[in-house]
Design a protein with these regions (language model features):
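Surface-exposed loop/turn elements that mediate protein-protein interactions on large endomembrane-trafficking
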Residues: 1-5, 31-51, 73-92, 118-133
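Histidine-/acidic-rich catalytic cores in large beta-rich domains
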Residues: 8-11, 105-108, 131-133
Length: 133
């Protein structure tokens, strides 16, 4: 049932996450954490809120081993324990891409005026707070 509701979201990525000892697979409205040796599902993270949802976009691993889940609107920081550290809501309206981590800052691009209205965004890696837009 991993990909049963993928219709409408073309994004699907998998990344080996050594700090957590898992493979993270993002698609639809979730990230599934899999055992590398067996492919067994260990846990999953659902994107969005109870009254609506964000959709999966991309995955990135920060300098300290944190997994960053980039949705269409939100950014979620996940610790190697697979617990959510923070959620930055409303970062974009139609997509977020990873540029790099520079020290304590996450450098992202956020689409704010589709199509093509990409703007740079800087988040604090420890808190998810907007540093600069």
């Amino acid at each position: 049932d991993i990909g049963e509701d993928r219709v409408g979201n073309p994004f699907c990525e998998a990344i080996h996450w050594p700090a957590a000892g898992v493979v993270a697979l993002g698609l639809a409205q979730r990230v599934v954490f899999l055992a590398p040796a067996t492919g067994a599902e260990l846990s999953r993270l659902t994107l969005g809120t109870i009254d609506g949802g964000d959709f999966f976009g991309h995955l990135a691993i920060g300098d300290d081993g944190t997994l960053y889940v980039l949705g269409w609107c939100d950014v979620i920081a996940v610790a190697p324990s697979r617990k959510v550290r923070w959620i930055a809501r409303g970062v974009a309206i139609d997509g977020i891409v990873w540029c790099e981590q520079r020290g304590p800052h996450l450098l992202l691009e956020a689409e704010m005026d589709p199509p093509g209205g990409w703007v740079p965004v800087v988040l604090d890696a420890a808190t998810g707070r907007h540093v600069e837009r």
